[in-house]
Amino acid sequence: MTEYQTIKFEQAGAITRITLNRPDAANGMDDTMTRELADAARRCDTEATKVVVITGSGRFFCAGGDLKSFASAPSRSRYIKGIADDLHRAISTFARMDAVLITSVNGVAAGAGFSFAVTGDLVLAAESASFTMAYTRAGLSPDGSAS
């Protein structure tokens, strides 16, 4: 089994559970997380997988892009492009795979986290869930397959 740094990937028979696991960063997406999500999506895109459940650890589903990692990247434009490319690959794979995708949204789903949350065939929102695009507040244009 592949070990991931920023997500938990658990398979039990035909069901896979993916947990975004950067609670100290509001499950914000950095280059490691988007690369791992793209790989996890590829692993789920099989006939053997019937259901994929995605959720977030801690108080947030996903706050979108990790703006701190964006700001500290040596080549900001190349870094953000890499994140967007991997995220789009993950979202595209999850959206077109035969397995049912359930997103279980706890807390905030913002920006790319919003786009990722609504990719689900079924979106389960806890009472704590809130959804916002939030791009203009960060001075960014929509990505994460939102446009």
Regions found by a protein language model. Give the residues of each.
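Conserved CoA-thioester-binding segment of acyl-CoA-metabolizing enzymes
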Residues: 1-57, 92
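Hydrophobic/aromatic residues within transmembrane alpha-helices
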Residues: 18, 54, 66, 116-118
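Histidine-centered beta-alpha loop that forms part of the nucleotide-sugar donor binding/catalytic region
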Residues: 21, 65, 106, 128
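Conserved phosphate-binding and hydrolysis motifs of nucleotide-dependent enzymes
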Residues: 27, 56-58, 64, 105-107, ...
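Glycine- (often His-adjacent) and acidic-residue-rich active-site loop
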Residues: 35, 56-93, 137-139
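CoA-thioester-processing core
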Residues: 90, 94-98, 104, 110-147
